[in-house]
Design a protein with these regions (language model features):
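A short, flexible beta-alpha/helix-coil linker loop
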Residues: 175, 218-219
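Glycine- and acidic-residue-rich phosphate-binding/metal-coordinating active-site segment common to enzymes
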Residues: 178-179, 222-224
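Short, flexible, mixed-charge acidic loops at enzyme active sites
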Residues: 82-88, 209, 269-272
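Auxiliary alpha/beta "docking" domains used to position bulky ligands
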Residues: 1-185, 231
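Iron-sulfur cluster-binding cysteine motifs and their immediate structural context
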Residues: 26, 191-214, 220-223, 229-256
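C-type cytochrome heme-c attachment and multiheme electron-transfer modules
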Residues: 252-274
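SIR2/sirtuin NAD+-dependent deacylase catalytic core
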Residues: 188
Length: 274
């Protein structure tokens, strides 16, 4: 059995801002909702979402012998995430202005896994950073990190939605698990629904990826059927920058997530060199 306190200390030492621990289980309620969402065609711009559904809702089908999921989060908010002036035509999602977070978080998780293997010789496990059919936002809720906001993003009390997630899936149980996050803290706020430039948030927690600027500029080439991109050329932060929880969130503390450029001042030559 693994010490939950030891896991969280490793996460802190690795540089993560948040860490929660949850037992592996079948997320049946989420599977029912997700299948209904797919049936309505809201995910048709992201065909890969229809694959590996059995693994997506039960991590035990993804990692043999899995018993525990450790969900870690790191804040990435920077001053450039506060929003763009009206009329700006070169908007880029806040997270994309810094280094690619995938290898950064992968190294952090790898450091944790190596330490756990030394401490618990019989342990095996895998690390994940947005690279597998893992329902990471819901796992974060199950691990007590936050709730799902009306814009369908994980919202944490400390850092809002400006967090990047990574997971450790382990084959031993923990001596303590965190309680799932109870309730939501959006109140009557509708800022994200009312601010989406393309109306992609068709209902609270329901996203039509065919309209979502972030999905269409990152996951799939845009076409004439897409509404006006409102100046966004990679990703979109509108449903985040308007959120009160994000407006009061602190800036990140890791140099890995310092912006590499300012889209408001970057030259044409610098754009082409990227």
């Amino acid at each position: 059995m693994i010490s939950g306190q030891y896991i969280k200390k490793l996460a802190e030492n690795a540089g993560f801002d948040l860490c929660g621990i949850t037992p592996c289980k079948h997320l049946a309620e989420n599977e029912s909702y997700f299948r209904e969402w797919l049936a309505k065609g809201y995910g048709s711009s992201l065909e890969y979402l229809e694959r590996n559904l059995d693994k997506r809702f039960d991590v035990r089908h993804l990692v043999e012998g899995a018993q525990t999921v450790v969900v870690c989060a790191v804040s990435y908010k920077n001053p450039l995430g506060e929003g763009y002036p009206p009329g700006c035509r070169t908007k880029i999602a806040s997270y994309a202005r810094s280094r690619d977070y995938h290898p950064v978080l992968k190294r952090m998780l790898g450091t944790m896994l190596e330490a756990l293997r030394r401490q618990y010789p019989g342990l095996t496990g895998r690390t994940f950073v947005d690279t597998a059919p893992l329902l990471e936002k819901q796992l974060a809720v199950e691990a007590g990190l936050g709730w799902i906001g009306r814009q369908s993003l994980l919202l944490t009390p400390q850092y809002g939605s400006y967090v990047l997630l990574g997971e450790l899936v382990l084959t031993l149980p923990s001596d303590q698990y965190d309680a799932p996050f109870a309730g939501a803290r959006c109140g009557r706020c509708r800022n994200c629904l009312d601010s989406c430039p393309t109306g992609a948030i068709v209902a609270p927690k329901v996203i039509d990826t065919n309209r979502c600027i972030s999905c269409r500029t990152i996951e799939k080439e845009s076409d004439s059927a897409l509404p006006d991109l409102d100046g966004w050329i990679f990703g979109c932060d509108r449903c985040q920058s308007c959120c009160p929880h994000n407006q009061k969130a602190p800036m990140h503390r890791s140099p890995h997530f310092d912006p590499l450029f300012d889209p408001l001042t970057i030259s044409d030559r610098e754009w082409l060199a990227m």
